[in-house]
Regions:
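Tubulin/FtsZ superfamily GTPase core signature
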Residues: 1-247
């Protein structure tokens, strides 16, 4: 019923993802599933989360038992003093859990594969920010600044290539955030922004372009934008922009 995915970088952080109910089986059918190593472990047991810096819990809110188990798993993880815990719930309704919840509304996606691709992008964006050394480093403390003491999270990733790729990728991420919450531009006091690209395709100019696009979008110009930049040579000419906001 339960499986745990763990991706470890001893130098920077330990990020783990727990699956509740059928979500593990669906995740494993996706092409990107092999990017994470599966571990045996029950996310409802605190021992599974010991030593974890950043934890994700994925559940399907359309299964009532899964919602209850998600809440239990959150408590189990929190009992270990985990630095950051992000539950991800596939649900049309907003449900409260004792941790900052990222809700994935299935009605906003084309199908199951699209839903899980979005979840994968959420996990990967946080992993890239906190666990991979970058051109301009963000770290665990930056993720904590946005997530801790929050009830809800908004997280989106945009990608583009070619002319004005940075601005286009930023706008794609913004559009996804707006789809999650029509008032996304005004809900947070701190925004975490990460720009990823190949070394040949990413400079301070591109990063500044993205930052200005996000700044112009935000209602409150006093909102703190914590930004970083990561190098990923596999992206070639693609620029990836990830935005995290806590409510």
């Amino acid at each position: 019923m339960f499986e745990t995915v763990k991706n470890m970088d001893d130098k920077f952080c330990n990020l783990s993802v727990g699956f509740i109910g059928k979500t593990a089986g669906i995740w494993n059918k996706q092409g990107f599933a092999k990017e994470f190593k599966l571990l045996e472990g029950n996310p409802l047991e605190s021992v599974s989360w010991r030593g974890v810096d950043i934890g994700f819990l994925i559940a399907d809110g359309r299964e009532k038992e899964d919602v209850n188990n998600l809440k239990k798993a959150v408590e189990a993880a929190k009992n270990t003093g985990i630095s950051v815990l992000i539950p991800i719930l596939i649900s049309v309704e907003q449900i409260e859990v004792p941790a900052p919840l990222l809700t994935i509304n299935p009605e906003n996606y084309a199908g199951e594969s699209d839903i899980y691709k979005n979840i994968y992008q959420a996990v990967k964006s946080i992993y890239d920010v906190a666990c991979i050394p970058g051109l301009v480093n963000l770290d665990l403390c930056d993720v904590q600044a946005v997530c801790n003491d929050k009830k809800k999270l908004l997280l989106a990733t945009g990608e583009a290539e070619g002319e004005k790729a940075c601005k286009i990728a930023a706008m794609e991420a913004i559009n996804k955030l707006t789809k999650q919450n029509g008032k996304a531009q005004s809900v947070g006091t701190t925004v975490l922004l990460n720009v990823t690209g190949s070394e040949a395709n990413l400079s301070m100019y591109e990063i500044q372009d993205v930052s200005e696009t996000i700044y112009d979008w935000l209602d409150d110009k006093q909102t703190a934008i914590i930004w970083g930049a990561s190098i990923d040579e596999s992206l070639d000419d693609v620029i990836r922009v990830s935005i995290l906001i806590g409510e």
